[in-house]
Amino acid sequence: MRQITHLVVHCTATPKNTTIASIRRHWKEGLGWKSVGYHKIIEANGNIMTLATDDKTTNGVAGHNATSLHVSYIGGKDTDDRTIQQRQAIAGVLLSWLQKYPKARICGHRDFPGVNKACPQFNAEKEYGYLYLTVNDTQEG
């Protein structure tokens, strides 16, 4: 089993109407990747698509993928444009991961050393930090 230390939130930095198929095509044909960029991707309506299981390594943050799980919302081209449904879906994904990996740190792609990106266009740790309390309450009770 992989040692998970980071739960990383991303944006696709694309328009909201971008399809998952076109994102996958970009990874494969445009970037030459053999695996996907994220474990889960969230459409504007909040639909969560699983692209890889937790035991698989994806291409989310260079140098940190072996110990990270990655979730992305479609959007975030120039600003944080998450829909309410995407905000809620991200929280649900992170909560389910925290229940399995309670010591993992929630962070954004931009929070890693040497990353020169705004992704995910907001402070993920600040926004979703309350989930740590939820997990701790569940584990203690």
Residue ranges and their predicted role:
Residues 1-55:
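Short, conserved "active-site rim" segments that organize catalytic pockets and cofactor/ligand binding
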Residues 1-12, 44-48, 67, 74-141:
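Basic/polar, cationic surfaces and motifs that engage anionic cell-wall
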Residues 28, 34, 59-60, 78, ...:
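Generic detector of short alpha-helix boundary/capping microenvironments
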